[in-house]
């Protein structure tokens, strides 16, 4: 009877406890960054019972213990503490040691993602970027992740490889692209292979 993100569900299966994190709620766009609590105005507007939200636990910190049943299914030891969970982009930034204001993680998979850390509570009125509570956020040291997603960038890169010649390696494509003057003589490619994204605002 609770709303869960995938990481919350996995932790629930391991521990038997239904919990979430502030970062998780922010991924679901139901976090009030100014008040530091679930976004009641949004929940009320859509008629969502706040009781559907699980209690929060810290992103880093004790979140429960592996149950005997989960231990039997996974091979983990019963009582093993579960001490961390986060979503894909906060995890990616964490894995790249992007933890402090001004630091940025940029990756290109299916989509192209730029994720920067800020100590400011701001938002984009045109909704071109998402804001997340970052993995190391605390009331004393604000750490928000600002995420720009260009949907389909990786797919567009693969398409360019097919067009430019399948024998080229991606690093060779990058070297060729580096020789092109800024502006590409007016050539534009909108890398939205999966459909338009919000950056078009």
Language-model features and meaning:
Residues 1-19, 24, 29-47, 68-201:
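Active-site core segments that coordinate phosphate-bearing ligands/cofactors
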Residues 32-34, 59-63:
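Short beta-strand to alpha-helix junction loop
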Residues 50:
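Electropositive nucleic-acid engagement tracts
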